[in-house]
């Protein structure tokens, strides 16, 4: 459920980030490509 070392975004991830999971089920967990 938690997004470790990433950021939570409503909807999709910004173009420069990679989706790696979800935050609390309804938000996207995004990380920088070099942090994935």
From Swiss-Prot:
Has antibacterial activity against the Gram-positive bacteria S.aureus 1056 MRSA (MIC=1.25 ug/ml) and S.aureus NCTC 4163 (MIC=6.7 ug/ml), and the Gram-negative bacteria E.coli O157:H7 (MIC=0.96 ug/ml) and E.coli 0111 (MIC=6.7 ug/ml). Does not have antifungal activity against the yeast C.albicans 3153A. Its main location: secreted. InterPro entries: Defensin_beta-like. Belongs to the beta-defensin family. It comes from Struthio camelus (Common ostrich). Disulfide bonds join 3-29, 8-23, 13-30. GO terms for biological process: defense response to bacterium. It is found in: Secreted. Keywords: Antibiotic, Antimicrobial, Defensin, Disulfide bond, Secreted. One of its GO terms (cellular component) is extracellular region. This is Ostricacin-1. It comes from the Eukaryota.
